[in-house]
């Protein structure tokens, strides 16, 4: 969730990274569903649609004591009022839920050289070559290098 917030803010300090009508699809647009990406203005990091359009899944749990495995959703959606399309607003749902106003953003940290690989996520040129050579179903989650 913290990574999502950092990316969505795009280096700004406010609840939004620009005039909402220029950066997000909300209920004010009277839409029947989500819109194609990148039709509104990006933030300073070059990211589009971090607010409005669809809520974005985060890996963090919403409140484990109360909701168990529910995961955090951020950003607001195309059918939501302006107040919910702010960086600080959060919602949650079960990880296997199917909802029309939620999606996900594929994100990846920087790729390390083999010398810089610290065992964290295993992202390096060597790790990527190894994963590309796997035949058949890909392993779920982190793939250790053997």
Where are the regions a protein language model picked out?
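Functional-site microenvironments in short loops/helix caps that host divalent-cation chemistry
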Residues: 1-89, 100
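Disulfide-stabilized, aromatic/cysteine-rich ligand-recognition loop
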Residues: 41-43, 66-146
């Amino acid at each position: 969730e913290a990574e999502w917030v950092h990316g969505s803010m795009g280096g700004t300090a406010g609840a939004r990274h620009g005039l909402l009508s220029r950066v997000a699809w909300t209920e004010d647009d009277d839409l029947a569903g989500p819109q194609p990406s990148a039709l509104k203005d990006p933030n300073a990091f070059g990211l589009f649609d971090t607010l409005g359009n669809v809520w974005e899944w985060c890996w963090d749990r919403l409140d484990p004591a109360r909701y168990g495995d529910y995961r955090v959703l951020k950003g607001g959606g195309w059918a939501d009022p302006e107040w919910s399309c702010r960086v600080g607003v959060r919602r949650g749902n079960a990880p296997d839920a199917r909802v029309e106003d939620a999606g996900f953003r594929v994100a990846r940290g920087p790729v390390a050289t083999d010398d810089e690989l610290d065992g964290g996520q295993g992202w390096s040129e060597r790790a990527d070559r190894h994963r590309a050579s796997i035949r058949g179903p890909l392993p779920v989650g982190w793939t250790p290098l053997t």
